[in-house]
Amino acid sequence: MNGTWKWKLAQFVELKWWQWYLRNKKTEDYLKWKKQYWKDILKKCAHDVSWSKDAEILDAGSGPAGMFMALEDYSVAAFDPLLPEYEARLQHFKKEWYPYVRFAVSTLEAFKNDPIFDVVFCMNALNHVSDLESSTNNLIAALKPGGILILTIDAHTHTSFKKIFRAIPGDILHPQQLDLNEYQNLFLQRGCKLVATELLKHSFFFDHYLLIFRRSG
């Protein structure tokens, strides 16, 4: 399931990327900035959806500095396949800093959970997976009926480049190469309702979007 060469290469490069990206960043300054970044995303979400203080929240594919950072007032679960490596090799991530989070080591494809979560975040992680179909199914399956799914994605802006990037590792970190409509349809075809789409950042190859869905029921 996670044995494809693109996925293995992406996981190797992901860790190296984080080491490179954080190499000159002071831990305290970076964590303060990143937490505020997530707080700003939550403010955007609040225009369209809300949840109670006793909500159960999942951060799927969290990485070392995920949405969990900004959810200190909630009961949170978070998972990522590289959490042990992040904690061992990055000074910017220690699980003990987040006592309100239940961390687990898992891929999206392997994550199986009863529908107990009111809100599921998957922030810039879905294009990292090996099996897109099972990963999408597992995200939805973790939600309670009527639950909220919030994603950020990098969506291709040009069909021609999307085809090229799919054929060769033009974007090594991301085995999945989709455009906005393809991302939206992954969830619409599974009965989710699209609540909001917001462009966060534009670039030549990719647009960075915030997507909000609600599970049927």
Describe these PLM feature segments:
Residues 121:
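A conserved beta-strand element that flanks and buttresses the S-adenosyl-L-methionine
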Residues 146-154:
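Conserved beta-strand signature within the Rossmann-like core of class I S-adenosyl-L-methionine
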Residues 154-174:
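Short, glycine-/aromatic-enriched active-site segment of Class I SAM-dependent methyltransferases
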Residues 58, 62-109:
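Class I SAM-dependent methyltransferase SAM/SAH-binding core
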